[in-house]
């Protein structure tokens, strides 16, 4: 922590009024403690539930550590999480944001899906709410942002799908595919990733047999299955299926006949399918057959191993990359919010908070606050999105999901494990 700020806080000079978005409580020692409310928008029961539950659990761990940090530094703050299940539904997400904002919450972690970000951006900007999403990856233009200024309250600690599209295209090439059928989720995120992926596939000389969109609320996959089966008929091993969507891929696979020719071809997924628990629970045998090679942003430090170990000890299993992203986001957001309150005498200032998050992301990455990043150096571009990153390639095996390779964003090469 910068000395000048820490000295003010530790020296007891800090004075803060109670604003709508914070509560003031009295500790056992009689000192005043300002509670910073943090909204957590995650999918706990929808198409991204595997990742949403991971984010909830890791934020609970972060909440404990941040509060301990504030206490040890003599800083009169405490963060308090307000968790809401959005089901990755844009309309539900907006309702949750509005409800939490009515409770005075002005800083949010999430939401997870790009369609959600797109749907709440108007409310975010008009009410000057600041958010950090760990997993929204659609390019800004696909979300309706025309300039970086319009997106100054929306941060994303993950690279956009311009990177992931390249990764998927290179995976297809490395696997020897010459022809592909692309099945994609018809929403802001799916459209963006599909466009970026197809562009890279074509650049790699891969023929696009068909591009098949599906409704995010789909239940019966039989029309998609029939169309894909007809398109792939008579094709050899150099033909594959690319699925751009969420964990509903498990339902799709489960509805495919055991003897279907679709299960004789390689499938490639994305970050919406990588490490999905639902896939293992509902369609593991079929997923093993098609491999379901899935890409996900990959950036971990030695510090991440400590958090992952604690995550496992609590019975939560293995945290995914987006859980690690939101862990870092919570730290940066909490430190920045506290600094904002210190600078304003306890008042909320969205423009200052936005500025501090951008600055403190660098300081946090460099360890200036005495806390180590779990996802490595976080460099943000002019749109407040993570500027670069490698992608892990995961596949379904008899032993579950396994990391089988890493795509290097600087070289475009894949290091297969």
UniProtKB/Swiss-Prot annotation:
Pfam families: Peripla_BP_6. The keyword Signal applies. The lineage of its organism: Archaea, Methanobacteriati, Methanobacteriota, Methanomada group, Methanococci. Keywords: Signal. Residues 1-21 form the signal peptide. This is Uncharacterized protein MJ1266. CDD domains: PBP1_ABC_ligand_binding-like. InterPro entries: BCAA_transport (IPR051010), Leu-bd (IPR028081), Peripla_BP_I (IPR028082). It comes from Methanocaldococcus jannaschii (strain ATCC 43067 / DSM 2661 / JAL-1 / JCM 10045 / NBRC 100440).
């Amino acid at each position: 922590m910068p000395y000048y700020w820490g000295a003010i806080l530790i020296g007891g000079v800090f004075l803060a009024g109670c604003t709508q978005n914070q509560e003031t409580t009295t500790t056992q020692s009689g000192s005043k403690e300002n509670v910073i409310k943090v909204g957590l928008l995650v999918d706990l029961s929808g198409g991204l539930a595997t990742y949403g539950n991971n984010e909830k659990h890791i934020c609970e761990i972060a909440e404990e550590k941040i509060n301990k940090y504030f206490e040890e530094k003599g800083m009169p703050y405490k963060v308090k999480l307000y968790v809401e299940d959005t089901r990755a539904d844009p309309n539900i997400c907006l309702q949750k944001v509005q409800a939490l904002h009515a409770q005075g919450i002005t800083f949010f972690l999430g939401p997870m899906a790009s369609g959600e970000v797109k749907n709440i951006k108007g409310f975010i900007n008009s009410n000057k709410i600041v958010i950090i999403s760990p997993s929204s990856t659609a390019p800004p233009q696909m979300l309706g942002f025309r300039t970086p200024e319009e997106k100054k309250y929306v941060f994303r600690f993950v690279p956009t799908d311009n990177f992931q599209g390249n990764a998927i295209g290179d995976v297809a090439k490395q696997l020897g595919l010459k022809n592909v059928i692309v099945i994609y989720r018809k929403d802001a995120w799916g459209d963006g990733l599909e466009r970026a992926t197809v562009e890279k596939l074509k650049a790699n000389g891969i023929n696009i047999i068909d591009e098949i969109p599906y409704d995010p609320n789909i239940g019966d996959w039989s029309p998609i299955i029939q169309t894909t089966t007809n398109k792939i008929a008579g094709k050899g091993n150099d033909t594959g299926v690319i699925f751009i969507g969420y964990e509903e891929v498990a339902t799709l696979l489960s509805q495919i006949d055991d003897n279907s020719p679709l299960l004789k071809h390689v499938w490639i997924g994305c970050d919406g399918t990588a490490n999905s628990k639902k896939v293992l629970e509902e369609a593991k045998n079929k997923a093993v057959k098609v491999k379901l090679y899935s890409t996900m942003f990959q950036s971990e430090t030695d510090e991440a191993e400590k958090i992952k170990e604690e995550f496992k000890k609590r019975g939560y299993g293995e945290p995914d990359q987006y859980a690690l992203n939101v862990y870092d986001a919570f730290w940066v957001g909490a430190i920045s919010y506290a600094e904002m309150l210190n600078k304003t005498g306890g008042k909320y200032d969205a423009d200052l908070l936005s500025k501090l998050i951008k600055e403190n992301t660098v300081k946090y990455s460099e360890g200036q606050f005495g806390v180590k990043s779990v996802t490595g150096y976080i460099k943000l571009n002019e749109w407040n999105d993570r500027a670069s990153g490698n992608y892990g390639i995961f596949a379904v095996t008899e032993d579950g999901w396994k990391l089988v390779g890493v795509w290097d964003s600087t070289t475009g090469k894949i290091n297969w494990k």
